[in-house]
């Protein structure tokens, strides 16, 4: 059986190396997020200030996988 995961929305606060970011969740928690394979494969650029959906494991709530970048009115895509 697959493990259950929580999905949160958050704001990218700082970019780290190798596709990792500090993400401030809507409940004010600060966690490390890494880019999922589909986002990496599609060359979707994630910058500080972007709103994202992040998938967090129930067992380790300090890290999460960024699964979606929410639309921003300033982007042209």
UniProtKB/Swiss-Prot annotation:
Keywords, alphabetical:
Initiation factor, Plastid, Protein biosynthesis, RNA-binding, rRNA-binding
Endpoints of the signal sequence = none
Q: What is its main location?
A: plastid
Which GO molecular function annotations are given, in alphabetical order?
Answer: ribosome binding; rRNA binding; translation initiation factor activity
The UniProt entry's GO CC annotations, sorted and at most eight, read: cytosol; plastid
Which family does the record assign? Belongs to the IF-1 family.
Q: Which NCBIfam families does the UniProt record give?
A: infA
Report the protein name in the record: Translation initiation factor IF-1, plastid
What lineage is this protein's organism placed in? Eukaryota, Viridiplantae, Streptophyta, Embryophyta, Tracheophyta
Q: Which gene encodes it?
A: infA
């Amino acid at each position: 059986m697959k493990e259950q995961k929580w999905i949160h929305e958050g704001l990218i606060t700082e970019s780290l190396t190798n596709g990792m970011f500090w993400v401030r969740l809507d409940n004010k928690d600060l966690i490390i997020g890494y880019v999922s394979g589909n986002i990496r494969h599609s060359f979707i650029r994630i910058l500080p200030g972007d709103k994202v959906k992040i998938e967090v494991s129930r067992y380790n709530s300090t890290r999460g996988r960024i699964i979606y970048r929410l639309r921003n009115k300033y982007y042209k895509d």
